[in-house]
Amino acid sequence: MAVTARNQRVAEEMKKEIARIIRDEVKDPRLEAGLVSVTGVELSNDRHYAKVYVSIYGDEEARNQAMEGLARATSFIRREIGQRLSLRYTPEITFKLDVSIEHGDHINRLLARVRAGEYADE
């Protein structure tokens, strides 16, 4: 499945608009528990489906609450995307938790511990 230039442009525009909608228009208190960032959008080749990857800063409870809030707001966000972007078909949106930032942070902490000598051979 090759990613076309058109799909890349649409995905980038969707990413920007979804971030704006979540930040400015979704009034769900569950989204205020953790800082929500849209990290990427992956479109199917026919542009009928979109996976929206989000990173949520906060503890496990804040992440769960924010994901519930996003699930509840999905139809509103999809409707807004349909009005803002001139697409033939507004994709069905699925939110996915992106843990790559936390994973990278964990690796950085491990590397810092190795540099500090915590894992030196005895």
From Swiss-Prot:
GO CC annotation: cytosol
Keyword Plastid found: no
A Pfam entry, by short name: RBFA
Top-level taxonomic group: Bacteria
The entry's keywords: Cytoplasm, Ribosome biogenesis
Cytoplasm recorded as keyword: yes
Entry protein name: Ribosome-binding factor A
Gene expressing this chain: rbfA
